Amino acid sequence: MNGDLYQELKKRISGEVRFDKVSRFLYSTDASIYEIEPIGVVIPRTHEDVFAVMEITRDFGVPLLPRGAGTSLAGQTVGEAVVVDMSKYLNRVLEVNTEERWALVEPGVVQEQLNLHLKPMGYLFGPDTSTANRATLGGMMGNNSAGSHSIVYGKTIDHVLETHVVLASGEQRVFKDMSFEEAAQMSGIEGRISDIVANNREEIDRRFPRIQRRVSGYNLDEFVRGKKFNLSKLIVGSEGTLAAVHQARVRIEPRPAAVALCVIHFKELVESIRATDIILPFNPSAIELVDDLILSLARGSLELSRQMDFIDGTPAAILLVEFYGENEAELRSKIESLEAALKREKFGYSYVRAFDAAEQTRIWKLRKAGLGLLLGMKGERKPIAFVEDCAVEPSKLAKFLVRFQEVIAKYDTTAGYYGHASVGCLHIRPLINTKSRREIQVMKDMTDDITDLVLEFNGSMSGEHGDGLARSHLNERLFGHQIYKAFQDVKLAFDPHSRMNPGKIVNGPPMTENLRYGEKYSTVFVNTHYDFSREGGLATAVELCNGAAVCRKQNEGTMCPSYMVTKEDEHSTRGRANYMREILSGKTGIEEFSGQKLHDALDLCLECKGCKAECPSNVDMAKLKYEFLAHYNEAHGTPLRSKLFAGIHNLSRIASIWPAMANTMMARPIVRQALDKYLGIDARRKLPPIAPQTFESWFRKRSRPPKATTANPAGKVILFHDTFIDFNYPEIGKATTTLLEAAGYEVAISERQCCGRPMISKGLPEEARANAAFNVGKLAPFVEQGYSIVGCEPSCILTFRDEYPDLLKGHAVDAVAKASFLLEEFIVREKKEGRWKLDLKRQTTKALIHGHCHEKALIGSRFLKETMALAYTVEEIDSGCCGMAGSFGFEKEHYDISMAIGQRRLFPAVEKQPDAIVVAPGVSCRQQVEHATGRKALHPAEALVLAL
C-alpha cells in the first residue's frame, strides 16, 4: 500500500514526497525521549498541497501528523503516520494589520522571524519560548506554548484569533469567534462541541485547575470560562490530533518601550522560589529560574562560558527578574525598590543589573540554553523530560518544590531545575538512564508519585510542554473518567477515524513504549582514528544530540550554515547526528558508516565547528565528519581531488620553485576549465597566487636563528608560518613579524610541516597524525624554553589545540597545545599581563571584522574585536560562516551553496559600507569576500601594521 500511496502523493503534490529510509529516520525523533519511524514525509509547497495530502491519506486510510520544527519535548511530533512538514515552504507572514493588531501567518513561520518582521512596526507576538529561533507558529499552536513572559502575555491560546484548518475528512474550515447561542444551533462540529460542553459544564469547571499554566487535555475550560465560542480554542493545544492548520490570524502586542533585568543570586534553590512571593507584587515581566547544575554545565560550554561574567560567585540558583517600563529611570526605580525589599527579608546575596539590550540578550542566552546543556551531560543518566513540566499556583510553588525533591530523593537520583517561577511552572528534570530496565521502572513509578503530588496541589502535569507520548496516558487520572470521556468525544467529533496524530491526548500508549534509548538499545563498536574519550566514545559523541534543534536557527551565529540555506533537516547537525545514531545502533548495517548515503548527508557540512560551540550539548559534527571520511576513504579509496587539496602544502612548495610560470598557468582559462572538468575545481574561482618569494626565505635572510635562552622568556615567539603565509601571502607573515618586533618580542620560525588541517578535512587522519607528530617534535623544545607559538591562520593554529590532542598523546602535545595562540588572542593576553606596551595610532577608517568560524567556535571573536579596537573603530559583522570553508567553496558541486551562504549576511554587509576596511583572519574568508564582492579583505596584522 505504501508504494501506491507514495505514487499518488507524488502525482498530486507540487512539494516534496519522501518515503526513503533516511528521511524516515530523520523524522522518527523530535526533542523528546521517543522514536517512531513514520510511514513517509510530505513537505507541502502550497496550501493546495496540504489539502491534497489530507484527501489522499483519507482515501488510503492512513494516519497523518502535522509537524513544524520538531522541537516537541513530549513526543508530540513522532508517530507511525505520514508526517507533513510545514516548516520549509509554508513560512510566510501574509498580512499585518497594526490598527487592529493582528498578523495573518502560515504555520511554518518561525516565532523569531515573525517578531523580526513586526519589530519595525513596534509590535511583537507575545508568547516567547526558549526555542523562539526555530519553533514555528504552527507548532506553538499545536502545543499551546507559552514561554518566559507568560505572566504578561499568557499562552498561545490567548493570541490566536482565527484558524484556517483542514479536517481529517478533507473539509476546509475557518474557526473564529461566534456566540454560544449560534454554535448551539449549528449541526456538525460546532453543535457537537456545544453539546459536549453543556453536558459536562459543572465537571469541567470542577476538574480543570484554576492556574495560568495548564495545557494538558483539550481546552474545554475555554468554553465554560470564556466569553466567545471559537473552535480555534480547541485546535490550539490539540497537538495536531483534530485538524491541520494551514493559516492563522494571531494577535500582536506593542513592544515595551524599555526593558531591564536584575539577576538575583541565591545560596539555596528553595530560597530562590520563596523569593518569588516578594518579587511578584512588583509586577515583573518575567521571573526565570536557573539552577547550579545548569550554571556548572554552562561553564563547560565553549560559547556560554565566555558570556558568564554576570555570575557572582557560585550560586545554588539565580532568578532572572525582568521589568518593562517607559524609560530607564522608571526601571532603575523598580529594581532599586525590589532589591531593597529582598534585602530586608534577607533573600539573595548579589543583584546584578542589566539595562543594555546586548547584555540582556547574553543573559537570556544562558537561560534558553538550559535544556540543551542538561541533555549534553556526560554519562548514561540524563535529565530527561517526563515530569519536567508541572505547574501549580505560584504561592504554592516553594512547598511543591520541597515535596518534589523528596520524591526525587526517594528514587536515589538528582535533577536539573529551571523554568518560569513567575507562573509556578518549573522544569524539573530527574536524571534517568532509559537504557536500564530498572530505571525505566523508576521513571514510571516516579511519574505516578508526581501525578499524585500534582493532584494534591491542584496543579497540572503540563504547564506548556504538552501531553504527547509522555503524559497522554495520565489524562484520565488527572481529569477523571467523565472529562476524559468528553475528550474522547471531542476527538471523535473532529476525527471519527482517529487518523490525526493518533495516540496523543487520548488513547495514549504507556509512557515507556517507543523510547529512543530503551533497555534493548545498543551500539556497534567502531575502531576510530580520532580519540573520542573526551566525549565518552564515538556513539556517545553522536548521542549528545538530543533533538533540541538549535541547529535550525536562521538569523544569528554560525551553526548551521548548510541548514540556513537548504532548510533541510538532513543538512542540520540534528539530522546528521540522527542518521549516524541509526547506523551505530545497528538499525542499518554498520557498513553504512562508510557508505554513500551518510556521505551525502555529511557532504554539505562545512566543518565550521559552529555546533561544537553553539549547540548547548556541544555536538562536534566536524569531528564526526572527519571520522566518517576516514572510514569512507578506506572503503572506497581517496578521490584524487581530495588528495590534491590535502597535499596543498607540497603542491605549493613545488609551485614556488617557478612562481611566475605557476601563476601564468593557473590564470589560463584552458587550465581552469580543465581543472573544472576533470577535477571539479570550479573555474569561477580564482586560485591563490604563488608569491615570488616565500615568507620563510624572506625571514631567514633577514634574521638569525633563535637563541636557546633570553632574558625575557615571555617575549619570545615562534611564528607558525602556515602554507598560505609561506607560499601565497607572505605579506601577512611580514606584517606579523614587524608588529611583534615593534612591540619588543623576539620572533623566530621553526622547521615545520603543514598543520594537517587539509588532511583532516579530507579524511586522511594518518597523514595528519604524521604531520602533527613532526610539528610537535619541532615545537615542544621551544615551548620548554618559554616560547609562545603564534599563528595567523585560525584553522591552522587552532588545530594544535583542538585536533592534535585527538591524534597524539603525551606531555609534548599538551604543552604545544597550551602554548599556541592566534595572533589577536596573543596580543590581548599579553596586553592583559602588562607585557604588550605598543601604542598604535588611531585610524579614522572603520574596520568591519569577520571572524573565522573556528576562531568564533573555539576562542570567540572578542580577541579580534579587542585587538582591532587598539587602532580602529570596530564593527563586527554578524555574518556566520562565509561559505568558503577551505576547499569546500572551490569544489564545483558546492560553489552555489558556498555563495548562497555568504550572500545571506556577509556579502551585503561588506557591500553596504564601501568606505570601511574589511578585516578577516581566515584566508578562506578573505578569498570569499574578494571573489563575491571584488573587495580585498585584510588580515588583522596587515591592518594593525598600518597604524604603527
State each model region's role.
Residues 9, 32-64, 82, 86-129, ...:
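N-terminal glycine-rich flavin-associated loop
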Residues 32, 140-142, 150-153, 160-366, ...:
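C-terminal substrate-binding/cap subdomain adjacent to the FAD-binding core in PCMH-type
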Residues 248-250, 282-381, 415, 419-421, ...:
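Terminal amphipathic helices with adjacent charged low-complexity linkers/tails
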Residues 23-26, 72-75, 131-137, 212-219, ...:
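A glycine-rich phosphate-binding loop feature that marks nucleotide/adenosyl-phosphate handling sites
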Residues 495, 502, 517, 622-948:
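Iron-sulfur cluster-binding electron-transfer modules in prokaryotic oxidoreductases
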Residues 1-59, 69-101, 130, 153, ...:
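N-terminal flexible segment immediately upstream of the FAD-binding catalytic core
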Residues 223-242, 249, 255, 260, ...:
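Long hydrophobic segments that form regular secondary structure
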Residues 381, 456-461, 468-604, 627-637, ...:
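Ferredoxin-type iron-sulfur electron-transfer modules and their immediate structural context
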